[in-house]
Amino acid sequence: MSGKKWDEEEEESSAPNSPVLAPGRRRFDDEEGNESDVLDSWDAAEDSEVEREKAKKAAEAKAKAEAEAAANKKSKAQRIAERQAERARQLAEDSDAEEETEAERRERLRREQKESDLKHAEDLFAGIGISNDRKVVSKGTIVQIDPKDPNNTIDISTLALFNPTTKTQFETLRTTLGPMIGKLSPKPHYTLFLQEFSKQLAKDLKSDEIKKIASTLTALSNEKLKEEKAAEKGGKKSKAAKTKTSLAGVGRGGAIAEAHDTYDDDAFGDDDFM
């Protein structure tokens, strides 16, 4: 075999059987760009969702605040309308009550009277001071309004008068209860009652506070003693003056009687008519 033919066969054997493809660089860049666009779209969607949620919450808060403001700022006309609606409701209940029994009617009237009395008492002492905290109801605070109806009662501890907090409110309580209790002083058991009552009222005070109260009572006792002594002296003087006047009258009467006897003896003797 000649050398030229050998070279040709060697070149044919070393030639590639299939063509070599170029790397798909362009395709990879396109895919990366698409993925970046998708991520950006997701981020934008998340941001939009957050903004919508914030806007929704802000709108709800604003609506709630406006509703509360409207509820707290009712006009006079609105309040009147509400009261009229309440009256209409009560009238409707009264019309429905036409079919109620006599016992049910008495019970309804009793309940309405009790509510009316309580409302009247609260209105009477309105502004004195109201406590929002409801205390446990004690049996001693329940007062029977109607002696014939044991169920017709009222809890006086709920009245504003008995929940004072300021000096003025305590003064009002004193001026209200003082005359009511003081008018019982002529009764025979009043002194013992007042002793026990004062002791009960002051039992939770400190010793120095009780001493102040005792000093006030001592001063009152001294004033009363002076008044009683002055009245006693005045009575003695009046009695002595009255006794002196009576004695003087008796003395003058004796002199007149004596003169009358002398006149009868001297001027009109029995011998003068002989």
Curated annotation (Swiss-Prot):
GO terms for molecular function: translation initiation factor activity. Residues 1-120, 227-246 are annotated as: Disordered. Residues 30-50, 93-102 have a biased composition (Acidic residues). Pfam families: eIF3_subunit. Residues 46-112 form a coiled coil. InterPro entries: eIF3-like_dom_sf (IPR023194), eIF3j (IPR013906). GO terms for biological process: formation of cytoplasmic translation initiation complex. One of its GO terms (cellular component) is eukaryotic 43S preinitiation complex. Keywords: Coiled coil, Cytoplasm, Initiation factor, Protein biosynthesis. Its main location: cytoplasm. Residues 51-67, 79-92, 103-120 have a biased composition (Basic and acidic residues). It is found in: Cytoplasm. Component of the eukaryotic translation initiation factor 3 (eIF-3) complex. Belongs to the eIF-3 subunit J family. Component of the eukaryotic translation initiation factor 3 (eIF-3) complex, which is involved in protein synthesis of a specialized repertoire of mRNAs and, together with other initiation factors, stimulates binding of mRNA and methionyl-tRNAi to the 40S ribosome. The eIF-3 complex specifically targets and initiates translation of a subset of mRNAs involved in cell proliferation. This is Eukaryotic translation initiation factor 3 subunit J. The gene is hcr-1.
